[in-house]
Amino acid sequence: LKPKTKILIIAGSDSSGGAGIQADIKTVTALGSYAMTAITAITSQNTTGVKSILSIPAIEISRQIEFTSKDIKPDAIKIGMLHSVEVVNVVLKSLKKIGIKKIILDPVMVAKGGAKLIDNKSIKILKSKLIKRVSLLTPNIPEAEILTQTKIFSVNDMIKAAKILINNGAKNVLIKGGHLESKIMQDIFVNKKKVITFRNKKINTKNTHGTGCTLSSAIATYYSCGKTLKKSCEMAIKYVNYAIGTAPKLEKT
C-alpha cells in the first residue's frame, strides 16, 4: 500500500524501543504514513532510566535532514530530543533550508526515569528561537514548568503556562496533563484565539514510557494528512489512550 504521507522525525534513539525514534517510526507506520529519520543522539536506556547518551555530530544531523529531504520531501516534521546548543542551532539552520511548514516540537527535556536530556543553554535557544519556528509545541507539565519558569498544580496553571509560551512566540501549544493528580486526564490546547480542553478518563498503568513521543508523532501524521491542528491533537490523544490501554508488559520490573 502506498503511504498516505511522509514524516521526517528529528529525535534521539531509545535502545529499549519504547520511546524516541523507535516509538516515532512505529507510530507513523501504524497510522499509514512513511517515516524518515535524522538521529540526534543514541541513548542506552530501558523503562527504568537512561544509562548513557552518545551525541551525533551536528554536521551529520544536518546531512541527515537535508540529504533526506532533498530526495523525499516531508509533508510534516516531528522534532524530539535536541540535547545541545550545537544540535538546536543546526536543526534551526536545516529547517530554514528545507522550508517545511508543518512542524511539531516535543521539547524532550527529562526522561521518565528522571535523567536530564537537554542542557540549560539549549533550553534558552529553544525558547527564544525554535518555538517560534514550529506549528505546535507539546510539552508535558515538567517541561512546561521549565520553559515558563512557573509551577503547575492545576488546569488553570496549565492554561497560564500555555499563554506565556504563546506570548513568547509559540503559535499553538498543547500541554499534556498526565502529571496532575486526577482521575480525569486533561490536555490543554491553546493559541491566541482559543483555549480547548481535551478530557479523557486517566488509565491507571505504569505503561507510559514513550507516550509523549507517540503523541507528537501521531499529531504530525494526522496534520500531514490535512487535518486541522485541533483535530490532529484530538485524534492523536485518542490513539495514545488506546495504545496505553492495550500496551503489553514487557519489562521485568
Residue ranges of model-derived segments:
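Short pre-catalytic strand/loop immediately N-terminal to key active-site residues, enriched for Gly-Thr
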Residues: 10-16, 195-209
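Conserved phosphate/ATP/ADP-binding segment of small-molecule kinases
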Residues: 120-194
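Conserved N-terminal subdomain of the carbohydrate kinase-like
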Residues: 2-9, 23, 27-112
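Glycine- and other small-residue-rich loops at beta-strand/loop junctions that grip anionic moieties
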Residues: 13, 79-80, 115, 208
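Charged C-terminal helix
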Residues: 4, 55, 230-253
